[in-house]
């Protein structure tokens, strides 16, 4: 099982990625983890990436694709892999195709932006314990206060509505085009490509976790 998981921030990709990886015995691969590991190990690509990052630059797609190809050679990828947060752009997707990185499925978890804003901006956290609440779906017994300690809850900066809207704007402009890219490739094929087109599946990410997980596994069966 080799797949790419697509969806907006707050769509629940992280939760479903964990279930998919457990079911199929595959690793979850993120570019951030790969970069950190390569820099720590001092590999040639890691050294190159560190120079760019230390200078405050963005690591090039060529380096990222090189890291991906190295990562896929590792033994834990023999049964497949799940890409999390990669590719983010059409050029990265094209580079993956040119590098003959095989993908069986592209799975999009679709959640309306209004639902994501409500889901994320309603989160409240007890910092010391990490306990999380939601003002609508999982409220504390007393508004704004942790159930166990009686200490105040906070809204993380990442969960503030303005921040959520900005992240969704970035997704809409940068990553949403991948949805069209992969759905068109899956529908039309491309005889010039070095790899077969993936199957493209779209599921609703609205509902409880069990319902969404059932949709995910159903989509990955055909």
UniProtKB/Swiss-Prot annotation:
Enzyme Commission number(s) of this protein: 2.7.4.3
Keyword S-adenosyl-L-methionine attributed: no
Main location (coarse class): cytoplasm
Region span, NMP: 30-59
An example Gene Ontology CC term for this record: cytoplasm
Positions that bind ATP: 10-15, 123, 132-133, 207
One Gene Ontology term of the molecular function aspect: ATP binding
Pathway(s) it belongs to: Purine metabolism; AMP biosynthesis via salvage pathway; AMP from ADP: step 1/1
Catalytic reactions on record: AMP + ATP = 2 ADP
GO biological processes: AMP salvage
A Pfam family assignment: ADK_lid
Enzyme class: transferase
Cellular localisation: Cytoplasm
Oligomeric form and interacting partners: Monomer.
Function: Catalyzes the reversible transfer of the terminal phosphate group between ATP and AMP. Plays an important role in cellular energy homeostasis and in adenine nucleotide metabolism.
The protein's name in its UniProt record: Adenylate kinase
UniProt lineage: Bacteria, Pseudomonadati, Pseudomonadota, Betaproteobacteria, Burkholderiales
Gene behind the chain: adk
């Amino acid at each position: 099982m080799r797949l790419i998981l697509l969806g907006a921030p707050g769509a629940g990709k992280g939760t479903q990625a964990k279930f998919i990886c457990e079911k199929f015995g595959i690793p979850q691969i993120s570019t951030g983890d790969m970069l950190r590991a390569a820099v720590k190990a001092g590999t040639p690509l890691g050294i190159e990436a560190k120079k760019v990052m230390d200078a405050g630059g963005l690591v090039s797609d060529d380096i990222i694709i090189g890291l991906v190809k190295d990562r896929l050679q590792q033994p834990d990828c023999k049964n497949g892999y799940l890409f999390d947060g990669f590719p983010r752009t059409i050029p990265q997707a094209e580079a993956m195709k040119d590098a003959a990185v095989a993908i069986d499925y592209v799975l999009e978890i679709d959640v309306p932006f209004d639902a994501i804003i409500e889901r994320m901006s309603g989160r409240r956290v007890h910092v010391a314990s990490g306990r999380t609440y939601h003002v609508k779906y999982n409220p504390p017994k007393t508004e704004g206060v942790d159930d166990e300690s009686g200490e105040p809850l906070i809204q993380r900066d990442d969960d503030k509505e303005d921040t959520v809207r900005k992240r969704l704007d970035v997704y809409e402009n940068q990553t949403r085009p991948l949805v069209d890219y992969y759905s068109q490739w899956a529908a039309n094929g491309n005889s010039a490509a070095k790899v077969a087109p993936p199957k493209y599946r779209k599921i609703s990410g609205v509902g409880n976790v069990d319902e969404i997980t059932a949709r995910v596994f159903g989509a990955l069966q055909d």
